[in-house]
């Protein structure tokens, strides 16, 4: 709260991704109540100074669904304590080729979010990027490869993007 007040910020955005992506979901049942307590306590303190609290999180699905997404963020439990929910509707496919933020996935996430809080609180992060995935391996890197490339390593071929194809 001091950071917000001392810098005359409108509020603060909590973007805690470590417990979702680093700790793993085996810790989530213990982490979720602590997260909720933090959000609620910070909300009370910020609102006493007329300041905003937003949270940025990956997707969460309706708990009635078979897949729950990143349920550790407990949207339903923090909905009344936040002013904005910023949903990361990107990185659906990371390690394997696929869409970055498919519409059906984004819609499912948004439907749940607006079912538990005012739609005016819900914001989405849209992917403005693409990824290159290795699609085939041909040959080996030269022995005198530049720094950062291992000489003799397998050489990768990347799928050509639509923009590259159009420009050619």
For the regions a protein language model found, what residue spans apply to each?
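Chitinase-like catalytic core of GlcNAc-active glycosidases
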Residues: 1-105
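Alpha-helix capping and helix-coil boundary motifs
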Residues: 27-30, 118, 161, 165
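Short glycine/proline-enriched coil/turn segments at helix->beta-strand junctions
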Residues: 49, 118-119, 127
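Surface-exposed substrate-engagement region within the catalytic domains
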Residues: 73-79, 87-88, 109, 114, ...
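Short, surface-exposed, polar/charged, turn-prone segments marking secondary-structure boundaries
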Residues: 83, 112-116, 150-154
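Catalytic-core region of carbohydrate-active enzymes that cleave or remodel glycosidic bonds
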Residues: 101-119
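Glycan-binding loop/region signatures in secreted carbohydrate-active enzymes
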Residues: 128-168
